[in-house]
Amino acid sequence: SGLIKEPISNTFLGKLVKKGICMNYVIEVNESDFPQDMIEKKWTDESSNKEYKNVFRLESICDFPESIKENDSFNFVIDNDKENLCAVCYAYTPTPDKSVSITVLD
């Protein structure tokens, strides 16, 4: 099993833990092989004082499936090459500082 996995093609299981307005989405990943420097180990939502663990802000807001509801889980890959050029409103909702661009898999 000496195959080196390309990290970019790894599939991860995410959970949409906060579906904020204007695509301010917070995603939780509890997989140890997910790049740990891309997530915040602990993050407290100052609007609700709720603490989350292992979360990031959704950067790739343009093609995130609308069908995914808060607390739904989904499979995804990290995709840092995509451009996120779409209109989105700018209302402030607290989100983690770290953001990741992803592609959701069906």
Q: What spans do the regions from the language model cover?
A:
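Secreted/processed peptides and extracellular or luminal domains of membrane proteins
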Residues: E28, I68, Y92-T95
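Short, charged beta-turn/beta-strand-edge "cap" motif at the junction between a beta-strand
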Residues: D79-L85
